[in-house]
């Protein structure tokens, strides 16, 4: 694999192979840490679904620049959207709702202070690292194993959501909505995902 060439999936520029391999190793550590899948026989996949496991591919990106590289690699499933399925839908906050919240925060004098105890309100942004790995898989999905984790005759049965599966966003939505409700938040009436 040392002679193999890797390219940035966004820019198309050639990437340093050693940095790509390090980024992929980091991603595989996350797969193990979050127990994303259990290895099972490909035979089980065929018995349960009547189909081969879903293929996977690496998405490699340099989020930095040539002087300060910041390589990120994500292993994603290649589940093809053959048909539209409403049961896999995940709500997304409309841009208008976000604009309304920011406008309201500014006009009410809340500002963007991290801890504004005087007004009793707080506006904050949260970015969950590898969010989908925190969501349980809610349907039976089998994926091929990447070269870095392959075992002959085996595939992965998802335990957690995986980027590239059709219901990953919905699984994450169910997980974070349950958490937010549990700590006291309520869904909006006009936009339930706010």
Question: What positions do the PLM features span?
Answer:
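Chromodomain-type histone methyl-lysine reader module
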Residues: 1-189, 194
């Amino acid at each position: 694999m040392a002679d193999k060439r890797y390219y940035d999936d966004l820019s198309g520029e050639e990437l340093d192979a050693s940095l790509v391999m390090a980024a992929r190793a980091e991603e595989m550590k996350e797969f193990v840490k979050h127990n994303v899948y259990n290895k099972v026989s490909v035979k089980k996949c065929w018995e349960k679904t009547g189909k081969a496991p879903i293929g996977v591919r690496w998405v490699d990106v340099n989020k930095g620049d040539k002087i300060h590289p910041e390589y990120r690699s994500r292993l994603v499933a290649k589940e093809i959207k053959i048909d539209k399925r409403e049961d896999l839908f995940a709500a997304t906050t409309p841009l208008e709702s976000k604009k309304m919240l920011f406008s309201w925060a500014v006009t009410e004098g809340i500002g963007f202070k991290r801890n504004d105890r005087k007004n009793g309100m707080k506006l904050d942004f949260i970015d969950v690292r590898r969010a989908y790995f925190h969501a349980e898989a809610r349907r039976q999905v089998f994926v091929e194993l990447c070269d870095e984790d392959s075992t002959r005759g085996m595939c992965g049965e998802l335990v957690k959501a995986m980027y590239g599966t059709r219901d990953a966003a919905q699984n994450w939505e169910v997980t974070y909505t349950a958490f937010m409700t549990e700590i006291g938040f309520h869904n909006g009436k006009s936009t339930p995902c706010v």
